[in-house]
């Protein structure tokens, strides 16, 4: 049931304005997902010290290519590998037919913060693309989202979503699953932390990851495996490049 609002004008001056179509659609989708999906969030920190060193070393190559290498392509590749290794995350539930729809493709949505609200363009076949191709495509789609130039087909077909607040701040959050997907990865701001290496504490750049998932489709042990795979991949840049 909806929540009946009081007359706020009795408390002070107010102004009413119509919701944009995007805001109304997003609100409906969020409410539908939250009401229908039993959410659980698994948290993990990934050591991205070496990854960041490698990424920053690509600055000159990026200038030649006209592409900026951000952390997002690494996250995309890591998620694509994890989805391939743990295919129970690459499904949708058809509750009416009592069936699990298993997808043989890996398309990943990237949440983009725009002046007009949140938009989620989709990168197709992430598992078949290299880091530079993913960097170029994600930048192009994000710009199209900000310019309100995305086509409907460019926002459809995702198996999984990545939403990042790392450029703003925060240490963890619970992203809402974008149903009919069954999982979404939230990325917070990386920070230097002391990490014990067996002999002494070392300063390491740690990236907080928050994996929300549909507990009907995914159990807790598999969620822990998924974030562990992500942490291992992001912590060893060689594994992502193979």
Q: Regions from the language model: what does each represent?
A:
Residues 1-242:
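C-terminal catalytic/motor cores of large multi-domain enzyme assemblies
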């Amino acid at each position: 049931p909806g929540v009946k609002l009081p007359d706020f004008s009795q408390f002070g001056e107010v102004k009413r304005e119509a919701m944009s179509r995007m805001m109304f659609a997003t609100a409906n989708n969020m409410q539908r997902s939250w009401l229908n999906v039993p959410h659980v969030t698994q948290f993990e920190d990934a050591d991205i010290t070496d990854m960041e060193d490698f990424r920053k070393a690509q600055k000159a190559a990026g200038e030649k290519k006209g592409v900026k290498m951000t952390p997002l392509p690494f996250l995309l590749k890591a998620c694509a590998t994890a989805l391939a290794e743990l295919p129970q995350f690459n499904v949708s539930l058809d509750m009416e037919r009592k069936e699990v729809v298993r997808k043989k493709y890996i398309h990943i949505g990237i949440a983009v913060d725009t002046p007009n609200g949140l938009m989620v363009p989709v990168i197709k076949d992430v598992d078949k693309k290299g880091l530079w191709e993913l960097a170029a495509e994600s930048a192009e789609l994000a710009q199209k989202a900000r310019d309100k130039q995305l086509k409907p087909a460019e926002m459809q077909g995702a198996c999984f979503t990545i939403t990042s607040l790392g450029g703003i701040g925060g240490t963890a959050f619970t992203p809402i699953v974008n149903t009919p997907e069954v999982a979404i990865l939230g990325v917070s701001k990386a920070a230097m932390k002391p990490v014990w290496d067996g002999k002494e504490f070392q300063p390491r750049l740690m990236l907080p990851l928050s994996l929300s998932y549909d507990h009907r489709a995914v159990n807790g042990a598999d969620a822990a495996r998924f974030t562990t795979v992500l942490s291992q991949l992001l912590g060893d840049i060689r594994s992502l490049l193979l």
